[in-house]
C-alpha cells in the first residue's frame, strides 16, 4: 500500500526528494513551505482556487469515451481525460493558478518560470497577466526554435522570454537559469516550477494542484461505468500530468498504472529521455531522483520529438513509485508517438500534443492485450496546436 502522507516532513519519498540547494535558497524554500502548509487547507484559499479553476480554466473538463479509436483497436475501451480543453491548452494551468494565488498571498510582485514545450511558460505568463505580476520565462534556445508559436504567445501576454544557450539548450538548462535568477531575487520573486521535480516543497505542492485531474477522472469514470477503470496511462517527462492522474488512485490496488517515458530514437541508441527506465539515482535540480548521467555523474543530453518530455530527470515521487512497483514505467519512441498522434487525429478528430501522444501510443498497445469490457483512462495532457510545425517538418511540409 502507498502511504498517503508522503512526502515526510523533510520532503522525502523514501530515499528520493529532499532539498539539495545552495544555502541562499534554503530560507526561500522554508518560507514557501510555511506558506503552502498554511494555505493548503485554508478554506478561503481553496474557495478562490476552486472558483478560478471553474470559471477561468474551465474545469471540470470531460472524460471522453474514444469509441472509434477503441473500436479500431479492438480491445479495452479508451477514455481520454481532456486536459487539452483547459484554458491555454494543457494541464499546466492547474498548477500555475494555484502557485499564483500563493504568490499573491506571500506578497510577491514578480514570477519566473522554466519551460520546455512552452506550455508551462504560456500558463505562467497567463496567470501573471491575470494577477498583475512581472513575468520572466527561461527557455532553451533549442526549444525556442521548436516552439515559436508558444514563444510569441508568452511575449503577447507580457512575459520576457530569456533564451538559454548553455548545455543542451533545453529544459534542464532553462531550469538551471531560473534557479540562478531566484537566488538573486528571492525577496520579491516567486519561482513557479512547472513539474513535480525540484526541491521540497515543489514535488508535493505541484502534485496537490494537479491531483484535480485524477479526482475528476475517478468520479467521471464511476458515473459513466459504475466502477473504477482497469488501467491509467500518462506520459512522464518531469511527471506532473501523470502524478495528477495517478495520485487519487494509488490505493486502488485493482487499478494498474502506467507511466510512459520518451524512448526517442530507441533506448539502445542512447538518444532518449527515459530516466526511470535507463537512468540511475542521483541529485538534479534540488532533489534526489532517477536521472540520465554518465559514469562520472555528469548529466547526459537527452532527446525526444516532444520538447516537454526532453528532460534528464523525473519527479522524486515517480522514482519512489517505480521502486515500490506501484507504477510500471514504459518507453515509447518518436515514431510510435507520431503514429498515435495521427491515429487519434484521424479516428476521433482530436489532435493531441506530442507529449500526450506517447501515452496514447502505449494505451493502444495495452488495450490490445485487454478485453472489450475493460477500460483505460489516458491523460490527454495537452493539445497539438504547438506541434504543427514539428510534425509538418517530419512530413516534409513547410508551414
UniProtKB/Swiss-Prot annotation:
Cite the record's note on assembly: Tetramer of two alpha and two beta chains.
Record protein name field: Tryptophan synthase beta chain
Q: Does the keyword Lyase apply?
A: yes
Record-linked PROSITE patterns: TRP_SYNTHASE_BETA
What does it do?
Answer: The beta subunit is responsible for the synthesis of L-tryptophan from indole and L-serine.
Q: Which Gene3D superfamilies match?
A: 3.40.50.1100
Give EC number(s), comma-separated: 4.2.1.20
Q: Which PANTHER family match?
A: TRYPTOPHAN SYNTHASE, TRYPTOPHAN SYNTHASE-RELATED
Residues modified to N6-(pyridoxal phosphate)lysine: 92
Output the Gene Ontology terms for molecular function.
tryptophan synthase activity
- Gene Ontology CC annotation, any one: cytoplasm
One Pfam family linked to the record: PALP
Q: Enumerate the catalysed reactions.
A: (1S,2R)-1-C-(indol-3-yl)glycerol 3-phosphate + L-serine = D-glyceraldehyde 3-phosphate + L-tryptophan + H2O
Alphabetized, the UniProt keywords read: Amino-acid biosynthesis, Aromatic amino acid biosynthesis, Lyase, Pyridoxal phosphate, Tryptophan biosynthesis
HAMAP family assigned: Trp_synth_beta
Does this entry carry the keyword rRNA processing? no
The gene that this protein is the product of is trpB
The kind of enzyme this is, by top-level EC class, is lyase
Query: Which pathway does the protein contribute to?
Result: Amino-acid biosynthesis; L-tryptophan biosynthesis; L-tryptophan from chorismate: step 5/5
Q: What are the TM regions of this chain, as residue ranges?
A: none
The Swiss-Prot or TrEMBL record lists the needed cofactor(s) as: pyridoxal 5'-phosphate
Name the protein family. Belongs to the TrpB family.
Question: What InterPro entries has UniProt attached to this entry?
Answer: Trp_synth_b_CS, Trp_synth_beta, Trp_synth_beta/beta-like, TrpB-like_PALP, TrpB-like_PALP_sf
